[in-house]
Structures are given as C-alpha cells and as structure tokens.
Amino acid sequence: MLDKIIRIATRQSPLALWQAHYVQHLLQANHPGLQIELVPMVTRGDIILDTPLAKVGGKGLFVKELELALLDGRADIAVHSMKDVPIAFPEGLGLVTICEREDPRDAFVSSHYAHLDDLPAGSVVGTSSLRRQCQLRERRPDLIIRDLRGNVGTRLAKLDNGDYQAIILAVAGLKRLGLENRIRYAMSAEESLPAVGQGAVGIECRLDDDHTRQLLAPLNHRHTELRVCAERAMNIRLEGGCQVPIGSYAELEGDTLWLRALVGAPDGSQMIRGERRGPAAEAEQMGIELADELLSRGAREILAAVYLDNPAR
C-alpha cells in the first residue's frame, strides 16, 4: 500500500500550499511511511487578476488545471477549498473526501474600524464575492463595494495601502495562515451567510483509483460531509456554480441538521432567505427542497439576471 508515491496537485498560493501540506500531514499520520510529493500548479484563476471572477468563469478557474493533472496522470489527488469546487466534475473524477471544517464565517478586516457598523458612509469595502457584496449592500447601502482579487497577502496589502477602508475575507484562510490578529471580528451567519462549503477542505481523485481512495478514507469527517452535502445539494439544484450571490450554511445539532440559504440580487435590493430543519441523514434531500422553495419565491429570476450579466460562470 505504501510503495506508491502519492502526488498532490495544488495551486501555488500560500493558502493552497497550506491546505496541501495539511492533507499530506493527515495522510502520513494515518499511514506512517507513506511517500507524498506536491505538484504545484498555476491556474487561470491565479493569472487573471484584473477581471471579476464572475465575468471570466467563476471559481472553477482555480480547479480546472488541477483536474487535468488528475486526468493525465501527473497527480493522484487534488486539494481544494470546498467553496471553490464547481457543482459538476469531469467524467472519471469525483470528490471523495471532505476534511473537518474550520470556522466557516466571514471576517471583517480593517485597519481603523472595529465593526462594519462603524464604517462612515462612503467607505470603500473590498470583496469580489457577489454573495458578500449583496449582503453588504443590503445591510449598508451607503458603502462603496469594490472588487478585490489576489491571494490573501495581496488583499491585505491593498487594505494597508489605503485602497480600502475594510475588506471581507474568510476566517478559515486567515487562521490557517497565522493571520488571526488581522480579524476585527467574525461576522455571524445572520450578518453574512457563508459560501457553500466555506472553511472545509475537499479532496478530488480518479474514481477508479481504489488504492488512493482507501488511503483517503480515514480523512473524511462525517459531520462536515453531511453539512457540506446539504449545502452543495441546494447549490446544485439552483445550478449555482461558485461565483453567484448564493449563501448556504448547515449546522448539526445532534442528529438534526439546520440548513439556511439565501439568494440575493447583487445590488442588495432583493434577498430571498429560507431554512430547513430535519434528520441529518436526509441532508441532500433537505438541500434540494430548500432550493426549490427559493426558486418558487423568486430566486430563479434573480439568478437568470445574474447569468445574463455574467455569462461565463
């Protein structure tokens, strides 16, 4: 079992490399002596930094090159932030493991202000996420929301240079990079509902690679898997992709799953929210039913307008 070297395809950003090393550590802790090699790659999402993601294909741009490496045999597994994983996979590939979730909340980051509510009218807030943008605009229509691309370090540098009065990042990413001190506060799910899968690390591989799948099996975290399953089922039913104004967050309370979701107009003028509670074993069905409810209440029209503006998703 341990003779073969496991090659991990990963992006080259500091956060992506952290995630790859994290999976390497988990694998070697479960399989002492296992040899692992990282295969760092540059994706289109890392190269195209001057255009909002929604305009150039969404977050799937961050995974396509990694998937090609799996398909042509250059790598055995690919490690992803779950919030970047598209709703569909190339034939022969699939998501086989979801590791234990880190804090899924959004972080308010600012050099001079402790809270979103403290920002003066006209302040510039940076985020490229349509999900974050619509919730910010609903809560604070007096703010100026501007796109913000690049890795975490680049985004923080732009904040420190005074380009923005505040930026919104993922708590999980900042914690993983040892940058917790930059978090002014973690935004509640009521204030900023997280993205589908936010805070979780997923592992993709060839579905016919039984050897690798056996090695990965102990890394799967069942509670996280159930939560993310519900969130992704909702997103798939909405045909949501990764770069659309959709939020979804599931929590486990014993054997009961509590799923919340929203679809919002990017300008914050319309927000459709819903929730479901039910047996955790029915996570996928709950996600589908909640999506159907949102669609029936106007989400279909909101998403159609978004896709018209951003045909590459």
Swiss-Prot record:
InterPro entries: HemC, Porphobilin_deaminase_cofac_BS, Porphobilin_deaminase_N, Porphobilinogen_deaminase_C, Porphobilinogen_deaminase_C_sf. It comes from Yersinia pestis. One of its GO terms (molecular function) is hydroxymethylbilane synthase activity. Gene3D superfamilies: Periplasmic binding protein-like II (3.40.190.10), Porphobilinogen deaminase, C-terminal domain (3.30.160.40). Belongs to the HMBS family. It is an enzyme of class 2 (transferase). Binds 1 dipyrromethane group covalently. GO terms for cellular component: cytoplasm. Pathway: Porphyrin-containing compound metabolism; protoporphyrin-IX biosynthesis; coproporphyrinogen-III from 5-aminolevulinate: step 2/4. Its EC number is 2.5.1.61. Its cofactor is dipyrromethane. The modification S-(dipyrrolylmethanemethyl)cysteine is found at residue 242. The porphobilinogen subunits are added to the dipyrromethane group. Keywords: Porphyrin biosynthesis, Transferase. GO terms for biological process: heme biosynthetic process; protoporphyrinogen IX biosynthetic process. CDD domains: PBP2_EcHMBS_like. The keyword Disulfide bond does not apply. PANTHER family: PORPHOBILINOGEN DEAMINASE. It catalyses: 4 porphobilinogen + H2O = hydroxymethylbilane + 4 NH4(+). This is Porphobilinogen deaminase. Pfam families: Porphobil_deam, Porphobil_deamC. The keyword Cytoplasm does not apply. Tetrapolymerization of the monopyrrole PBG into the hydroxymethylbilane pre-uroporphyrinogen in several discrete steps. It comes from the Bacteria. Monomer.
